[in-house]
Amino acid sequence: MGPSSLLHPAFASSAGPTRRTIDLADCRERLVRHRIYGLVNSAPRLRRFMESHVFAVWDFQSLLKAMQQRLTCTSLPWVPTLDPEARRLVNEIVLDEESDELPEGGSASHFELYLDGMRAAGADTGPIDGMIEALQAGRLPQVEQPAATVGEVVAEAMRASGAPNAARDFVQKSFAVIESGSTHGIVAAFTYGREDVIPDMFRSLVSSLASRDTAWARFHWYLERHIEADDEKHAPVCRRIMARLCGDDPAKWAEASRVARECIEARIALWDAIAADIETMPAG
């Protein structure tokens, strides 16, 4: 991948010949070349990786739903939102991410696919299952509901379930963006902090898994599916939404750039922590 591919032009189709770029080449390069990918070289190490990374997979779905809430009408009574094109684009992404078609038939979210991959590989799903169960049941005695923010509720659920500290920090960054009230900030986090970088990150993991046991087949399919969907479809769509939101407003583009950079740095910090943990384990 050449340096020019790290700069993504965005065109605001509703605002004339506006052209904007968000330059994330330096931090993006550090992310896609992180040492974590070379360290995931054995079954125990991959299981350890998955046990932390699964929280980022869940976090992805939460960012997507925040984006959908901002760009479409998800409450009653229904009313049309301002940008029908953005509405259609985000709903297309939700369809794929929340209810993708499975190779054997049926549908599942990519989060559920990841959990299936973890179980098939023998990874511990206890903490992530505990977090989801706590959120579903509202069993969070340390949180004063309904006064608590969504981020506070999630933080307590993660703490109570024993989620790794680095995963908790990563998720809290995302919910800080969600609760900021900035639609273009949320879309920037999802576009440049998720969809735009995930294909290159996952390609490195796919290479590491190429000769692994069939127990990783489900996880391998999840990675391949994300690479295909994000690289060819979702990332370009997200950049179109980004352009429509920011238009020709330099302040919005500056904020989007700041949020995108902070999200990539948060991912690097998560990778640093997981790598440090994995390095205490025997090499593959």
Model-assigned labels for residue ranges:
Residues 2-284:
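Non-heme di-metal
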